[in-house]
Amino acid sequence: CSQSRGLGDVYKRQLLLVNHDGKVVQGDKDVNVAAFAIHSRLHKARPDVNAAAHSHSIYGRTFSTLGKLLDPISQDACAFYENQGIYKDFSGVVEEVDEGDEIAKALGDKKVAILQNHGILTTGPSVDIALWFYMSMERCCQAQLMAEAAGKPISVSHETAVKTREFIANDIAAWASYQPAFDKIVKMQPDLLD
């Protein structure tokens, strides 16, 4: 999409198809330069990633200011255990693809990244999967912020975190978990796919 919009305000007809040089192939709006700088380089570095979700949501953005990874303090947080990168070189609005390259490098082969002082980014082989990981990560950021405000959270063991991650963080589980949210969105906005 060419402009920043809430997910509830995006329709299929507003989407742009952009080539690797930033030229609009389909659609009639201008390209969001910052989005192109991040997403184009991410897709170039990670051909397995068909979708990436990123916004400046309140809990992800707040958690990103801590400059650290999510801890495995809950079952849901275990989905991101040893599966998150961190980009610590925030220098304002991303305008150059070189910074997009650095963000892709920080993500590495992981599913998600924390962009320090900026927000969170999640990936997947489909939009559904990337969005599910985004929604889940946002809630995990919220939970860890609340837990740390209340005291010192206790992490689960490495073995438990790995076992839990393998069970809940696979693409099939993520896709299936997102379907009720998608159904609700389509029910609320039947013209979404127009």
Model regions and ranges:
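Glycine-/small-residue-rich beta-strand-loop submotif within the FAD-binding core of flavoenzymes
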Residues: D9-V25, P72-A79
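Short HxH-centered metal-ligating active-site micro-motif
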Residues: N19-R61, V97-D109
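Structural motif
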Residues: K23, N50-A53, G60, C78, ...
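A conserved C-terminal secondary-structure "cap"
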Residues: K111-D194
